[in-house]
């Protein structure tokens, strides 16, 4: 039996999580495995109830779990708190740090049926694409020390430090090559090795790791060229392996060219296969409680959890196929429809119900 910590959070988090749990129960029944779920407060809801965005009780529940299914956190109510107390920073960074979740996987898929949503030219978007961005999460300029500000007046200076160790690059590289072996056997490593010492080390270590995966093609791109190529022809990519800063930027480009953040799941993993799974989008407080939120990113996050942490690949594939059927058959929330067709939009629960029925009938 697998134990899942459910951290629905704020905004639309609770309502899309209902649909993800519904789908999980459906595939568990279909594929004859057992899961248990336990709900815990996180983010703004936890601040209101416990005075802390990441309470001890929530952390204890996560420690006892086999995986974390995370919703979304934050909203205007908590926006004026000190930065270290804000839901997004306290909750997410606290969990990433405690569990050493160094690998972020964000699939970005555009199905031809939804090509009109993409910001790309129609001749590009109509081909569809399927890119997996693997981003190192715990190193790079975000966490390097020293950092800060010093001096006064016109001479005041802000500074940051960019660091990567051989160990950090090696472990994320192995995961990228292993992911490529399960896809289309190509890794594009992104760096700025013509300028940065960290990128020179990054490229060297990636090439050393690549020797262990002779069936996987490796190419290197400078980050500026990678950004340009993503919007020129995303179909050329399979797995993109990125340092923290570059991956942060490129994964958001991938999100934009799919046309909706409501479709994009993500996984954050450690070396033991423990992971936290969450939608790529935010808490969308402006539509919370209206029953119009798109639950697909949350549902696909549950599919990633089944694949990478719970060893239920067939169940994950069943969810993904059911989602594809929903999209192909026009079972869409309002964010996926042009303004003149939104009268035909399905509610959050209707989309979840349809996906469950597709799984049951497959």
Swiss-Prot record:
NCBIfam families, sorted: leuB
Record organism: Colwellia psychrerythraea (strain 34H / ATCC BAA-681) (Vibrio psychroerythus)
Residues at which NAD(+) binds: 75-88, 282-294
Membership in a protein family: Belongs to the isocitrate and isopropylmalate dehydrogenases family. LeuB type 1 subfamily.
Keyword line: Amino-acid biosynthesis, Branched-chain amino acid biosynthesis, Cytoplasm, Leucine biosynthesis, Magnesium, Manganese, Metal-binding, NAD, Oxidoreductase
GO molecular function: 3-isopropylmalate dehydrogenase activity; magnesium ion binding; NAD binding
EC number(s) per entry: 1.1.1.85
Subunit structure: Homodimer.
Cofactor notes: Binds 1 Mg(2+) or Mn(2+) ion per subunit.
Domain of life: Bacteria
A Gene Ontology BP annotation from the UniProt entry: L-leucine biosynthetic process
Reactions performed catalytically: (2R,3S)-3-isopropylmalate + NAD(+) = 4-methyl-2-oxopentanoate + CO2 + NADH
Protein name per UniProt: 3-isopropylmalate dehydrogenase
Alphabetized InterPro entries for the sequence: IsoCit/isopropylmalate_DH_CS (IPR019818), IsoPropMal-DH-like_dom (IPR024084), Isopropylmalate_DH (IPR004429)
Keyword Magnesium attached: yes
Gene Ontology cellular component terms for the protein in this record: cytosol
Pfam families to which the protein is assigned, alphabetical: Iso_dh
Site feature (Important for catalysis) residues: 142, 192
Subcellular location as annotated: Cytoplasm
Function statement: Catalyzes the oxidation of 3-carboxy-2-hydroxy-4-methylpentanoate (3-isopropylmalate) to 3-carboxy-4-methyl-2-oxopentanoate. The product decarboxylates to 4-methyl-2 oxopentanoate.
Binding residue positions for substrate: 96, 106, 135, 224
Broad EC category: oxidoreductase
Cofactor(s) the record lists: Mg(2+); Mn(2+)
Pathway the protein takes part in: Amino-acid biosynthesis; L-leucine biosynthesis; L-leucine from 3-methyl-2-oxobutanoate: step 3/4
Keyword DNA-binding: no
